[in-house]
From Swiss-Prot:
It catalyses: Endonucleolytic cleavage of RNA, removing 5'-extranucleotides from tRNA precursor. This is Ribonuclease P protein component 4. The gene is rnp4. Binds 1 zinc ion per subunit. Belongs to the eukaryotic/archaeal RNase P protein component 4 family. It comes from Methanothermobacter thermautotrophicus (strain ATCC 29096 / DSM 1053 / JCM 10044 / NBRC 100330 / Delta H). Induction: Constitutively expressed (at protein level).
Length: 140
């Protein structure tokens, strides 16, 4: 391990704490929005300190300008336009744009994978079936 590099176990703990803080922010938002904003800020600080990426599912849940936790319909507006998902923060008015292409590709890939696995199981069933004489292939 070179000098200044953190051990893997430390990075794993940081990732777990980030996830816990975002889940707590999500739970706490309806009762106490300021506390959820603080949880988001703490999670972001941990990510910066340990140089760990915030998971994609949570990256879109806080404002990049004011760092407040975003709850669609409560303090942010979500719109889809021109192949992008637009999040508008009601706290500061900042608009974040994320490309919609990745979601489309993931959905298309999952559809193709589920279709090929269904066909693959059908082929396996027909291959192991009995032949015309009523004997299985192992009886020959």
């Amino acid at each position: 391990m070179r000098r200044g590099k953190r051990p893997r176990w430390m990075l794993k703990i940081a990732e777990e704490r980030i996830d816990i803080l975002f889940r707590m922010a999500d739970r706490e938002f309806s009762a106490n929005p300021h506390r959820s904003h603080r949880y988001t800020e703490l999670a972001r600080n941990i990510a910066m300190k340990y140089r760990v990426r915030i998971p994609r599912e949570w990256r879109r849940r806080f404002c990049r300008k004011c760092y407040s936790f975003l709850k669609p319909g409560a303090n942010c507006t979500v719109r889809i336009a021109d192949g992008k998902v637009n999040f508008r923060c009601h706290e500061c008015g900042h608009i974040m744009r994320f490309p919609y292409i990745r979601e489309k590709k993931d959905r298309r890939r999952n559809k193709i994978e589920s279709h090929t696995t269904k066909e693959g199981t059908d082929e396996q069933i027909t291959v192991g079936a009995h032949n015309k004489c009523g004997e299985s292939q192992s009886d020959r």
